[in-house]
Amino acid sequence: MKLTIASLIVAIAAFAAYAQAPTLQIVTSDPNLPSDLFYGNVKVKPLRVRPGTNPPQFITIDDSDFFTQQQYVDFLSRMPDASGFGFWLNQITSCGGNAACVAVSRVNTSGAFFLSIEFQQTGYLVERMYKASYGDSNQTSTLGGSHPIAVPVIRFSEFVPDVKQIGQNVIVNQGNWQQQLEANKVSFSQAFVQRSRFTTAYPTSTAPAAFVDQLFTKVGVTPSATDRNTAIGEFSGAADISDVAARGRALRDVAENATVAQQETNRAFVLMQYFGYMRRDPNGGQDTDYTGYDFWLTKLNQFNGNFINAEMVKAFIESSEYRSRF
């Protein structure tokens, strides 16, 4: 709250200097998700009051129900469904007043969202599609001395709208979710391969075999003959990749390859700590490079992907940067 109050004082002083009245704005980028509150051009935190309480009881990120809801918003880009919400909330509230149990359950609950079928088939798939299409981004880390580091190429500003598109109307284990998810994947992949960035990287005159080989090279995987032939076969013997639907299917064949998914897991898991909890890129905000990302990826690898033993999720949800969002 101190940072917010300080920001408001600065903003008020600035507006006063120019004799302009500040305005309070509610900004909604997605009508299905919580809105942002701005005082002038300064983003501020709203006071959340629990309905029916008198005197008012304020809701914070320490409240189990609000914390659980936020995992849906940050990782699945949707509000929680009743059954799922009840299940995850119970994982925390079943601890009663045992603070140590609550702390562990919050970590386990939050980490489970990355590992969930819904996220693996939406957000994580989007990350792998960017990887298959554009490879890595070369950045810098100072961990153990300054050195280059290859990191996921997708940026937060790209990730957010793409996840909303591919996950639209999907709630695992509800209704015809599998058919809806597949329809979303088809629609998203076809739109993705028609973007100018993609068609510039892969002209439609490219031969299917060359196209598929480039995609597998980007992900750093040598495919089996079967996997390679399956992806090439999407073009049904055509001489080029002008068929949009076939391009989309071939890209998915590579991005959904089991080896690719396994190899990219830890890198994506660390990336999602920044995208999900901090709502920014790893080299944004208080970070000017990928040193923090490098630190957590190194630690997660040391613990063979065990985020609990690596204390990665714990560190992010207990960080002042995360908590100050609320």
Regions found by a protein language model. Name each.
Residues 1-21:
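Sec-dependent, cleavable N-terminal signal peptides
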Residues 18-326:
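Composition-driven recognition of low-complexity segments enriched
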